[in-house]
Amino acid sequence: AQATIDETCAASTIILLSPDLKEELPVLYLRVRDAAQKRKARIVEFSSRDSGLSPYAWRTVGFEPGHQAQVVRETLTSAEMKEQLGRGQVVVVVGRPNLAENEVFTLQALAEVFGVVPNAKVLPVLRRGNVRGAVAAGLTPQNNSGDAIDILNAAAAGKIECLILLGADPMSDVADAGLVQRALAQVKNLISIDTFVNSSNRNADIVLPAAAYGEKNGTTTNLEGRVSNVVQKITPRGTSRPDWMIATELSIALGVDIGVSSLEDLNQKLVSSVPAFAPSADAKSTHGDGVLMTRETPVTISGSPTKAVDRNAYNYRLIVSRTMYDTAQSTVASPSLVGIINDSAIYVHPLDLARIGVVEGTNVRVGAEGTNVVIAIRAHNGVHRGTAWLPFNHTGVDVRPLLNIAGDVVDVRIEPIK
């Protein structure tokens, strides 16, 4: 069953199989930290590197990417841990902690938790705003239609004539930059609906400007499924307009009336066609604290176990994760925020820095499967021996060529430049 944020903070045990909440979901981080400090919840953190919650965790258990399921199984079956898990409600905070590994490893670790605590609840943590609402509304692969990577592969193969980017910037978000470049080069018509001009839509055939948050009315759905209203505060710039208006006028131009002429019509259409949004039928229910969506049917975790290959002793297993401030368009476009984005660097344990034979701040050559980048290296006590951490989407060096979206894990060689 799914947990709410309140249920998570009231749990006796909070198990973290998630990214660094302090960096990616700072408000949730504050709630969980408060639960550990004042409500006596005990945090059991499984992490490939130290996070912002590590100082507040009852137990922090490290693992090398690809081996978390085994570590979770061995940890939770100890006598001490079984006693703690039996003290009350257990909630698992689950998200993708590493962009350089197959997400199935995290799901396998979650399955191991259920094997020990069948009645545990789960709080799925999705980083981007309103992703939960988009998933509930059906913006996920249907009937084997393929996900974003499948669409890009089809475009790169010349099988898609018109590609529409609905608020998407694959050049910045997709790890395989080469795939995106080939896909955008092959499509005959590229249409973008976005608030900003970005690296993906800069050469688009058509860009339809969409109003940003604060420039339109509507609702948003947070990671726990809580629907709340958003209110227009300023007038959209230039000819920008809410995206639902763009969709309505496009449908009319194409000879199809979707039956939406106001925000009220749109909300009614949503709640009548998507049962999960039924509690938000009354617009007033989304004011204040909002209203929780109807809980979805529980899902089953299945599939063949995937095992990561062992790491060569000369290599370092890569950890790639996001930070609070990166080169996201809204950050780059803000004069007060753009200056706090850090340059790209690779972080290793101080003892590994000596093993590589370099001093902190010097440039090193980082290689993976025939691809090399030159990047500054820094020491970090929170990075485990034998692993290397790369913050994603920072300024300077583009680290995406090192990533393999088809692989289970990424191992890199770090060498001094002679």
Each model region followed by its residue ranges:
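A cross-kingdom feature strongest in bacterial/archaeal respiratory oxidoreductases
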Residues: 3-5, 10-16, 22-52, 56, ...
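Helix-loop-helix junctions within predominantly alpha-helical proteins
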Residues: 261-263
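Active-site phosphate/pyrophosphate-binding segments
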Residues: 55-156, 278
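Generic alpha-helical structural element
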Residues: 17, 21, 61-64, 95-102, ...
